Curated annotation (Swiss-Prot):
Disulfide-bonded cysteines: none
Family annotation (InterPro entries): ATP-NAD_kinase_N, ATP-NAD_kinase_PpnK-typ_C, NAD/diacylglycerol_kinase_sf, NADK
GO MF annotation terms: ATP binding; metal ion binding; NAD binding; NAD+ kinase activity
HAMAP family in the record: NAD_kinase
Binding site for NAD(+): D77, G78, N151, E152, H162, R179, D181, T192, A193, Y194, S195, L196, S197, Q252
Name of the protein: NAD kinase
Biological process terms in GO annotation: NAD metabolic process; NADP biosynthetic process
Record's function text: Involved in the regulation of the intracellular balance of NAD and NADP, and is a key enzyme in the biosynthesis of NADP. Catalyzes specifically the phosphorylation on 2'-hydroxyl of the adenosine moiety of NAD to yield NADP.
Catalytic activity: NAD(+) + ATP = ADP + NADP(+) + H(+)
Protein species of origin: Aliivibrio fischeri (strain ATCC 700601 / ES114) (Vibrio fischeri)
GO cellular component terms listed in the entry, alphabetical order: cytoplasm
Length: 297
């Protein structure tokens, strides 16, 4: 029975059986929640790693999105990206427990999750919505493939690194043509990921904006460009490109692109509902993860 006084009633634990420490974290959170009489469901990918948990507690990610009102993602930012592309379709809040490297998207310490997570369960948290991008590959006027990205959509060569040629249109207005190793189209969330490595700007996560970052352009005048989030970006791939290219979504999903194709990138109607502990500060995260200097006085 649902407790209307609780901020959340059905909680899903999501992740992959990466290593023994991650499995230990999944199990600790599961028992800690069940001891408080929460209904707890788990990612089906954890079934074999957690044989002591009843089989009916496990389900696939789409079903967890339907059934749960809070998802706890255990792992690094990669796990959060994969979960975000699915869970953004549902009315579910998401928080992360960091078992990865940088952890821009995963707030909770796996060894000390109890106190901050208890505060979140009590309704004491910060909530924000992050948008995703949709990527479509068009060929001869038809959509051949599509997917979504929480961080970035990247146009790049296939198996062999080489220059590629393409034109960029924004809302069907020609912006520029380019010969480069590719192009990164990033959300504000992704501005601290691959885009940052490519020299792109850091965008505050609440900005409704998209950054367009060239990858090793064959010109000295090319610079990153930030456009309004509602703009429709179209990449026209030159027929002169000799090999098949690729569009990568979050570095996890790859769509083949042929010479002469068009790639359409636009804001998804879906939003991921991220929640953070009450003391969350985006600028503290930047200072901590990027090694910025502390206050002088």
């Amino acid at each position: 029975m649902m407790d209307m006084k609780r901020a959340f009633n059905v909680i899903a634990i999501i992740g992959k059986p990466r290593d023994p420490n991650a499995i230990k974290t999944h199990l600790s959170i599961y028992h800690w929640l069940t001891d408080q009489n929460y209904t707890v469901l788990l990612d089906d990918r954890l079934r074999e790693a957690l044989p002591e948990i009843p089989a009916d507690r496990f389900n696939h990610l789409l079903k967890l999105g339907e059934l749960a009102d809070l998802a706890i993602v255990v792992g690094g930012d990669g796990n959060m990206l994969g979960a975000a592309r699915v869970l953004s379709r549902f009315d579910i809040s998401v928080i992360g427990v960091n078992r990865g490297n940088l952890g821009f998207l995963t707030d909770l310490d796996p060894d000390n999750f109890e106190e901050p997570l208890q505060a979140v369960l009590n309704g004491d948290f910060v909530k924000e919505e992050r948008f995703l991008l949709e990527a479509e590959v068009h060929r001869h006027g038809q959509v051949k493939s599509h997917n979504s990205a929480f961080n970035e959509v990247v146009l790049h060569p296939g198996q062999v690194a080489h220059m590629i040629e393409f034109e960029v249109y924004i809302d069907d207005t020609f912006a520029f043509s380019q010969r480069s190793d590719g192009l990164i189209i990033s959300t504000p969330t992704g501005s601290t990921a691959y885009s940052l490595s490519g020299g792109g700007p850091i965008l505050s996560p609440n900005l409704n904006a998209i950054s367009i970052v060239p990858m090793f352009p064959h010109t000295l005048s090319s610079r990153p460009l930030v456009v309004e989030g509602k703009r429709h970006i179209k990449l026209c791939i030159s027929p002169e490109n000799r090999t098949t290219l690729e569009v990568s979504c979050d570095g996890q999903v790859s769509l083949p692109v042929s010479p002469g194709d068009e790639v359409h990138i636009f804001q998804s109607p879906s939003r991921l509902k991220l929640i953070h502990p009450k003391d969350y500060s985006y600028y503290h995260i930047l200072r901590n993860k990027l090694g910025w200097s502390s206050k002088l006085f």
